[in-house]
A protein has these predicted regions:
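Short runs within selected transmembrane alpha-helices of multi-pass transporters and secretion channels
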Residues: 75, 144-162, 170-178, 199-212, ...
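Short alpha-helical transmembrane segments in multi-pass integral membrane proteins
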Residues: 1-24, 82-149, 191-247, 303-370, ...
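Transmembrane helical elements of multi-pass membrane transporters/channels
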Residues: 22-41, 143, 154, 177, ...
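Transmembrane alpha-helix boundary and packing residues in multipass membrane permease domains
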Residues: 27, 31, 43, 80, ...
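N-terminal transmembrane alpha-helices
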Residues: 11-49, 65-77, 81, 106-113, ...
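Helix-terminus/linker motif at the lipid-water interface of multi-pass membrane proteins
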Residues: 36-55, 124-131, 187-194, 254-287, ...
Length: 451
């Protein structure tokens, strides 16, 4: 493995518990820093451009989040394929995986950018954006979607580095990207007067520069990333595997936005206080989601490498260790959020009313105790995906979607806002009911070939 031996973190050896924790901590820090940036970005737009501009940016956030989730899942699937080849110590397979990922990412960028930009006006009409903010909403969304290539490039490089065992470099450049983004936000909006389009360009340029720098560091640390012409030969089987892994993961991550959109629609119908309380509570809820996503990234790369190496017992040990770590973090999140739920609301609202507290309290006190179900879902679903079983996670995703929509739309007329509060726990439980038995059945059988 001359191509990777210098910087690769081999997750097929050593203590599973400490290997996972060492890998996960940088990812958790990166996710938390990204959340901080998102909040700072909203403050800059709102304070400098006003409420209408903030509303314009916020009104398109679900569409942009939908696209970004698909990109992250799609390229994350490529990372699983590379991690499996890395675990198998298959240098030729690793090169072909990198080549296939690069080729598919280029094609995907071109197609997605064209579709998104051509449909931008129609998307805004579908969303019924108010006329007084539709112009700014279009400017912001069009620029962000025009820069889809930067997002794909950035996520592809980050997921490749993590697949090779390096979770620190993506952290460093995520921090760099976030700081640069905030600086460019201020520069483009205040002295250059570029409006919300300036905020969009700040996002795209910071991601692109971070991707380029990540690639430079990656090429230095991992010679396996230096592609040759022959690496692109006979890629049909490799491309097929990457598509089978990447598309379901992209779909699973983005389809969750549909369920969230249904929940938001019900909340919107309940009035301003409900929207304010739910929004503030959702910001706190994001902390747990980000931590669970980080643990998903860690166990994904761990299982992929050990699946490629054919080490079933080590996979079993790693899943147990990941469950302990994930549920430990979730317990801390639950206790912290429940104890600090009112100060958290005051972070986002200067003078919250009793009614707003009622809605935020209702959401957090119902959802937070069920974070442990989310932890089970995160670990088991990702472990199954990393062992080349995409059907069960896809089915679980559809169960989540159906249960989330059924709970909010079907029960809102009966129990009102409570339907929104119970939607996510019900969806998590339904998905786990399918995935946990699937995982244990898989572990009773010989591991399938990772070739």
């Amino acid at each position: 493995m001359s191509g990777t031996k210098s910087k690769e973190m081999d997750l097929t050896i050593g203590s599973p518990f400490w290997s996972l924790l060492k890998f996960a901590i940088p990812v958790i820090l990166g996710n938390l820093f990204q959340l901080f940036y998102t909040l700072a970005d909203s403050v800059i737009v709102g304070k400098t451009l006003g409420a209408n501009s903030l509303a314009a940016v916020g009104s398109t956030s679900i569409i942009i989040y939908f696209v970004f989730c698909f990109i992250n899942g799609f390229t994350g699937g490529f990372g699983i394929c590379l991690g499996q080849r890395c675990g198998a110590k298959d240098e030729k397979g690793m090169r072909k995986s990198v080549a296939a990922s690069t080729l598919l990412s280029i094609i995907f960028t071109i197609v997605l950018t064209l579709i998104c930009c051509l449909l931008a006006h129609q998307i805004l009409r579908w969303m019924q954006i108010p006329s007084d903010i539709s112009g700014e909403a279009y400017d912001y969304m069009f620029v962000v979607l025009l820069g889809t290539g930067a997002t794909v490039f950035y996520n592809m490089i980050s997921n490749m580095l993590r697949a090779l065992g390096d979770s620190k470099t993506p952290l460093y450049f995520l921090v760099f990207s976030s700081v640069l983004n905030i600086f460019l936000d201020v520069l483009f909006i205040v002295p250059l007067h570029m409006g919300v389009a300036g905020a969009a360009w700040a996002t795209i340029l910071s991601q692109f520069l971070s991707a380029v720098l990540s690639l430079i560091v990656g090429l230095k640390n991992f010679p396996i990333l230096h592609l040759r012409r022959e690496d692109f030969h006979d890629l049909n089987d490799t491309i097929s595997l990457h598509l089978k892994t990447g598309f379901p993961m992209g779909f699973q991550m983005s389809v969750m936005c549909i369920g969230q959109l249904a929940m938001q629609t019900v909340v919107n119908s309940l009035g301003t206080a409900a929207v304010a309380g739910y929004t503030a509570a959702s910001k706190a809820d994001q902390l747990s989601v980000l931590v669970n996503n980080a643990m998903m990234t860690a166990i994904s790369n761990y299982v992929a490498q050990n699946f490629g190496a054919g080490k079933k017992d080590r996979i079993r040990q790693g899943v147990r260790a990941s469950l302990i770590q994930t549920e430990g973090f979730n317990l801390l999140m639950c206790i912290g959020i429940l104890l600090l739920r009112h100060p958290i609301v005051r972070m986002f609202l200067s003078d919250p009313t009793v009614e707003i507290y009622h809605y935020s309290d209702a959401y957090l006190t119902i959802v937070a105790p069920f974070y442990f179900i989310l932890g089970l879902l995160a670990v088991y679903r990702t472990s199954i995906q990393s062992m080349q079983n995409g059907r069960a996670p896809f089915a679980a995703c559809m169960i989540e979607l159906v249960m989330r929509i059924a709970a909010t739309v079907g029960l809102s007329g009966i129990i009102g806002y409570t339907s929104v509060c119970i939607a996510s726990p019900l969806a998590w439980f339904g998905a786990c009911a399918l995935l946990i038995p699937v995982y244990y059945r898989m572990m009773k059988r010989p591991l399938a070939s990772a070739s």
